[in-house]
């Protein structure tokens, strides 16, 4: 079996051969299904929908028998619900084999084992289900965009091939809502970075960006960070119960009235689903500030942000229109009178960078403290900058005598050439490799930033570039940052820990076998450290930041290890980790920026942070012992957590 892995020394993607006994359960553990299973609002609403429709069908069918088809059964939870609510036969489909095996074990050890059959196939590949068609289809095949996991085809083909006439579907219908907003914050995740911050700058020409969804926990956006310009607009209405009404490609012009003047910088999106068509049982994805009475946190579905191809100004009380489009798998929105087809990036920036990285570059261009330090370090000097996709060299050009940008990514070099031409930066050159820098620079600068990095410490690739440069140009070559520090802090999240929590008994069903295989997989490997945008998740820090490893940027890369205790864990449920860099006279943090008097952390929105969730055996300890090993040969950091002697 082959697995893709990123070489942390070079940034290259490599294929490695897994051991013959590689356990796919490890993939199951890393997939973090726990949050979905522990979504009690979801579970209760599906249960209510099943209860209603099973009762209706039992009354309606002459023999009083009901066959339920569960598509994408996961642990088998919805199948168990259907059987307990009186379904006479349940056929459960699950294409992901480790999950299907898990469901088969759980259902076969339940009181309803004689009613439930688990089939490890995709619903669109199945031609018959146990000799009789379904009276009810239940499926949780949704994502942030509602239809992104193929819900439309799943329901349409199942109704056509696997269901009886009049088959009920749980859920029955769905609505998608959009709200146009003005927001400087959300602009930063999409706007092409402008070196001087002027609105009329177009260093990469005009580009509408990409129509791709930007999924985000909108509940953690502060209300002062955006301004709603109208009431929510119903963009789409989906009927999942009637195959003839399920259409893959549609376009609608929706009207709204502006309740204040402003510019539509972004569209906020969420959806709801009616579980039984009775209009009383909904799963509502509205964010917390819009849905105070019915809000339920979840991470397996989120809200989303979309951007119009062109920003649109509206005046108070003006009626305006937005074109709402969808195909089989995705949604997009466009301006009236313009091409309604999906917009694509033509500048190269949006197609290469994540929304988070676009924000990072825009934030860097706005960070006056950082720009002042770059100006001071660069003044009158030959500056070399290293990284992959780092815009630092463009900032250094303001005061430097000469700037050499070293970037191995050809597409980024093309983008930088466009910036150089647009801003007439005659003192900037670009080369591909650190070994091509033949003239000794006065100083080497880096953020450090490498686009291929998955977490903050993957930017330690910078150490290897500096090692080569110092071998070529001497140990006296000045480098900033001159120190990197890996840090950690205990935190109690309100909800994020659910993605790694044990599920145990859910709605009266024993799902502990899922915990057994997940825990076994997690403990058999290095500690699983997730990458998360922590600004999207509410929590309170419960102690001081702890230094784990220090990395002097002196040109000598060496393996190192440490053992450190993380205290106050009995009141915490996670350990966030991040890198800080000592850059000249300032500190650059990829993670924690500040802590309020109430203990609320502010996290850097331009990076993902690492976060470790203690396994069950460690969750009640007052202190955890962290063993961290930086391996020079691979550029990786391996983490192991265990009981502290102080616990």
From Swiss-Prot:
Entry keywords, A to Z: Methyltransferase, Repeat, S-adenosyl-L-methionine, Transferase
Taxonomy, superkingdom: Eukaryota
Q: What is a GO molecular function of this protein? A: histone methyltransferase activity
Q: Where are the active-site residues found?
A: 140, 149
**Which Pfam families does the annotation name?**
PrmA (PF06325), PRMT_C (PF22528)
* Record keyword Nucleotidyltransferase present: no
Q: What Enzyme Commission number(s) apply to this enzyme?
A: 2.1.1.-
The record's listing under PROSITE patterns reads: SAM_MT_PRMT
Biological process, per Gene Ontology: chromatin remodeling; methylation; regulation of DNA-templated transcription
Q: Does the keyword S-adenosyl-L-methionine apply?
A: yes
Q: Which residues form the SAM-dependent MTase PRMT-type domain?
A: 12-332, 337-647
**Function statement:** Arginine methyltransferase that can both catalyze the formation of omega-N monomethylarginine (MMA) and symmetrical dimethylarginine (sDMA).
| Family per record | Belongs to the class I-like SAM-binding methyltransferase superfamily. Protein arginine N-methyltransferase family. PRMT7 subfamily.
What's this protein's name? Protein arginine N-methyltransferase 7
Q: Which organism is it from?
A: Caenorhabditis elegans
Lineage of the species this protein comes from: Eukaryota, Metazoa, Ecdysozoa, Nematoda, Chromadorea
